Regions:
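N-terminal secretory signal peptides
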Residues: 1-10, 15-23
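A generic secondary-structure signal for well-formed alpha-helical elements
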Residues: 19-26, 105, 157
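Signal peptide processing junction and immediate N-terminal pro/mature segment
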Residues: 28-37
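Beta-strand-dominated extracellular/periplasmic modules and repeats
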Residues: 39-171
Length: 171
């Protein structure tokens, strides 16, 4: 599948219990069929699973259930909508818990390093709605040495971690 670079306002999807890349075909299917099961039934797109990735050194368990995770930090606004769907049917999964965390616009993680202050900025949890969507208000993550800009994701179902991954933009 040809991968299309993600813009700041891109809808990022989690396919099955893992992150999915949205290629050119998926974008066309989304326009024509609205994405999700209708797009899959059309044959224009299927659920594509990505490999598990490390949670990295900056995970803090027990984050707050909240939509706005900025804690007032400045940066380019980003509304991140993640869809959790069944890998076999591409149908939405209601009630999954999506946990995200990332660096602030300056490339700093909350809870780590001198001057990080609050342990909660750019960290939060949302449950998916009936359409399988979890929405977060955040800022576009900043870059730091040795890594591409990315957002960490964990998906939980019935108390179990079913996916750990990272969302990033390809050059």
């Amino acid at each position: 599948m040809h991968e299309q670079p993600l813009s700041r306002k891109s809808l990022l999807r989690l396919a099955g219990l893992t992150a999915a890349s949205l290629g050119t075909g998926a974008w066309k299917a989304r326009e024509a069929f609205g994405g999700g099961p209708a797009a899959v039934e059309s044959g224009a797109v299927s659920c594509v699973l990505t490999p598990e990735m490390t949670e990295g050194p900056y995970y803090i368990a027990g984050e707050k259930l909240r939509r706005n995770i900025t804690d007032g930090h400045a940066g380019t606004p980003l509304v991140l909508q993640l869809a959790v769907v069944d890998a076999s049917t591409c149908k939405p999964i209601k009630g999954a818990t999506v946990d995200i965390w990332h660096a602030d616009a300056a490339g700093n993680y909350s809870g780590f390093g001198a001057g990080s202050g609050s342990r909660t900025f750019m960290r939060g949890i949302q449950r998916t709605n009936v359409r399988g969507i979890a929405t977060f208000r955040t800022v576009y993550p900043g870059w730091y040495q040795g890594r591409t800009v990315h957002i960490h994701v964990k998906v939980h179902l019935k108390g179990n971690v079913v996916h750990t991954g990272q969302l990033s933009r390809t050059p």
